[in-house]
Amino acid sequence: MINIKIPKNKNDKFIEKFFIQKNLKIIVDLSKKNKPSVNEMVLSEAYMPDLKDLYRLYQYVLLNKRTTIFEFGSGWSTLIFNLALSELKVKFSKKINNLRRNNPFEIFVLETSKKFMKISKNRVNHFNKLLEIKNPAKIHYTQSDVEMTLLNQNICTQYKKIPLCNPDFIYLDGPDQFDVKNDIKGISTRHKDMMPMVSDILKLEYFYTPGTIIICDGRGANARFLKDNFKRKWEYICDNKNDQHIFWLNDPILGKHNKAQLEFYDK
């Protein structure tokens, strides 16, 4: 049985203190600005940071000693993944050499918007300098259009281009449902009553190694679509309190390299 570590719920005061101790008070201050309303779905500016979400993402990566992150979308989460992987890199860069991980302490960001990708990239570079991170995680940025498609006769979306990697942590927070090209029989996600429906994870499922974690930020309909169409054995938690859907691959170990990888996570 493959298990993962779930971060404990913390109150707002604890989380604010956590970020302040990381010299990230600016994120705490920005998080208190106004957030968009439920029907304000097409935004011209980047979202303000959500402290609770960011704290939990940081802890998921740290507690489970992730090595390679694939992020659908970009934003403040990209910065947090960078900080978490950079911390793990300092602690485990030598030990990782014994594993079959060819992109250790690297992040692959897949974004539809050149504008928001540039914002995320500049933000990460700014904080790397501000926090004097000498050897940060390596980040690969890929811009790709998204189109409507069919998977098992279900209408959904797919990216036209995906970066080559095999992550052990996948964060699903993109694309924006309005950044999708064409339609299928007149249907697309470009309507406020529709919802995101990414299919790319399903197409890559058989490449993932046991122990791989997927976190969906909200996107409950997309999480259900994944759950109903996965072929391998995935454990699933619907975390309503934090509006997250967590999957991890609890499949039979593939061989000695996968076994060593799982042992690294648990030590």
Segments (PLM) and residue ranges:
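C-terminal substrate-binding/active-site "lid" region of AdoMet-derived donor-dependent transferases
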Residues: 142, 153, 175-267
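Conserved SAM-binding motif I beta-strand of class I
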Residues: 92-99, 104-111
